């Protein structure tokens, strides 16, 4: 959602037709293109509780710095899917043994780590409400562990990455080609440990 009329419609529809409360998020950029910011102030005044481009990452650091500044000024929550598009290269599984075995393009854990490091560095200057939507690797946890007491941010993890690993992809199980991808068993174990260490704040499905 990137305009006020859609937010109005959704909230009216929820109020009139649903028995549950709807707390919508809007997109960070118009049409999820990662180029131009949406109208944070107008959307937030209509009841938006946060901003995210879903599984699309804000790749441009200049744009992310502008987003963080606006989020700080308006006390908005921004949620980032951490994946460098150049390193991910349209991969579908973890860059490892399974990718090689199946002849698939892999996604390096560096694609996640680099975006997290960049955003947390920007966060030092802007100090807005920032959430890393889903982490998947031990290397990302190392970064988070080092920065958690220095700056204010939250992190999430998918139940898939907590309960499955890259071996579960098996022989081309397309429904397990996820974003972020399932990583190694060592990564999965470190994610579970990170929950016990309070390094992860949210579990999503």
Role assignments for model-derived ranges:
Residues 27-33:
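Active-site beta->alpha loop and helix N-cap motifs at the rims of alpha/beta catalytic domains
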Residues 26-27, 53:
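Short glycine-centered, acidic/aromatic-flanked micro-motifs in structured strand/loop junctions
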Residues 35-203:
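Histidine/acidic residue-rich metal-binding segments in metalloenzymes
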Residues 1-17, 26:
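Metal-associated gating/positioning segment near the N- to mid-region
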């Amino acid at each position: 959602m990137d305009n006020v009329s859609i937010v109005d419609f959704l909230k009216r529809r929820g109020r009139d037709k649903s028995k549950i409360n709807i707390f919508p998020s809007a997109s960070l950029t118009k049409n999820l293109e990662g180029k131009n910011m949406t109208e944070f102030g107008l959307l937030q005044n209509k009841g938006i509780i946060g901003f995210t481009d879903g599984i699309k990452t804000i790749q441009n650091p200049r744009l992310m710095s502008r987003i963080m500044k606006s989020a700080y000024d308006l006390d908005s929550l921004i949620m980032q899917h951490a994946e460098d598009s150049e390193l991910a290269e349209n991969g579908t599984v973890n860059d490892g043994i399974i990718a090689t075995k199946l002849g698939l393009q892999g996604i390096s854990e560096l694609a996640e780590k680099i975006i997290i490091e960049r955003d947390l560095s920007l966060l030092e200057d802007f100090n807005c409400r920032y959430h890393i939507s889903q982490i998947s690797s031990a290397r990302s946890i190392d970064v988070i562990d080092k920065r958690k007491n220095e700056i204010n941010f939250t992190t999430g993890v998918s139940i898939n990455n907590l309960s499955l690993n890259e071996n579960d992809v098996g022989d081309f199980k397309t429904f397990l080609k996820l974003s972020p991808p399932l990583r190694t068993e060592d990564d999965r174990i470190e994610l579970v440990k990170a929950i016990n260490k309070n390094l992860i704040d949210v579990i999503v499905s």
